């Protein structure tokens, strides 16, 4: 009974949609994953005690862990650690490190999502799902028709919020390297930093997305806001070497376009098969 409640709590906490077989002995239960803001020791000596800090301790309390449960820790530097929970207090928890696994689950195709600011709920969705799909970087940009206006302290707080979403998405999907969520820039600021191949999704473009990229090189994918890019913005982007490309015959919403394009690139050139 306790095992059933434990698995249900993990599923709810991490918003998982598992295969029903995970509830039976056919498939082993995956231990819950937590991001450690504190660097984990390398090399890992089995039996080493490690203090996981307040954030992880709070999660363990919410899940009603009492000690003895096995969890997975990662710190963003690659690989993951199996650990056994030993002591939990209100502001801290101690685990015993069991072993280090150098496993990586990064996509073979490197994609930077350059996303024009959208409404708050849409941005949260875009950040979460793009991390799950395998992007390596996310660059939020302010554009003429963006509905979300951010500057100064509001922008800094929102970026911290997005970074927390990226961490939570990595905990859920199994990634051991957290994608970089950059600070908010204007379109022109971002264009000045353009290096390598960059593609702007534009319904009226002549070339297709898949026919415009070299998947062996990093790709920057530029997605417009709810109202789209202005003609002046597209002209400036093209002048900086950005390639307009179409993605199917339909005009997609800003929260759909980037995610669908990332999934298509991952299916054709990456590991989404």
Sequence positions of predicted segments:
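N-terminal positively charged helical leader segments and presequences
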Residues: 5, 10-102, 153
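RNA substrate-binding interface of SAM-dependent RNA methyltransferases
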Residues: 25-26, 102-199
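Non-catalytic positions within long, well-ordered alpha-helices that form the structural scaffold/packing
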Residues: 61, 131-134, 238
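Short acidic/polar active-site loop segments enriched in Thr and Asp
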Residues: 66, 136, 243
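Short, acidic/turn-prone active-site loops that include or flank metal/cofactor-
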Residues: 101, 226-227, 249-252
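Active-site/ligand-binding-proximal alpha/beta "capping" segment
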Residues: 198-234, 243-246
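Structured adenosyl-cofactor binding patch, chiefly the S-adenosyl-L-methionine
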Residues: 231-273
């Amino acid at each position: 009974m306790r095992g059933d409640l434990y698995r249900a709590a993990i599923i709810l906490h991490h918003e998982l949609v598992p295969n029903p077989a995970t509830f039976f002995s056919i498939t082993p239960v995956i231990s819950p994953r937590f991001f450690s803001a504190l660097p984990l020791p390398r090399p890992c000596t089995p039996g080493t005690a490690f203090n996981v800090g307040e954030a992880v301790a709070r999660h363990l309390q919410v899940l009603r862990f009492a000690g003895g449960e096995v969890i997975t820790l990662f710190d963003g530097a690659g690989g993951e650690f199996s650990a056994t929970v030993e002591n939990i207090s209100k502001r801290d928890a101690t685990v015993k490190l069991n072993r280090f696994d150098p496993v990586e689950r990064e996509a073979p195709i490197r994609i930077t999502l350059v996303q024009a600011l959208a409404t708050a709920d849409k941005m949260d969705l875009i950040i979460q799902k793009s991390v799950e799909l395998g992007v390596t970087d996310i660059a939020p940009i302010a554009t003429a028709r963006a509905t979300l206006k951010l500057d100064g302290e509001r922008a800094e707080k929102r970026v911290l919020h997005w970074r927390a979403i990226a961490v939570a998405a990595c905990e859920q999907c199994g990634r051991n390297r957290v994608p970089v969520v950059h600070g908010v820039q204007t379109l022109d600021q971002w264009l000045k930093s353009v290096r390598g191949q960059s593609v702007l999704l534009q319904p009226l473009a002549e070339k297709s997305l898949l026919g415009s990229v070299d998947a062996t090189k990093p790709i920057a994918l530029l997605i417009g806001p709810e109202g789209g890019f202005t003609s002046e913005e597209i002209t400036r982007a093209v002048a900086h070497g950005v390639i307009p490309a179409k993605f199917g015959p339909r005009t997609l919403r800003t929260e759909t376009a980037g995610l669908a394009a990332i999934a298509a690139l991952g299916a054709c050139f990456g590991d989404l098969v």
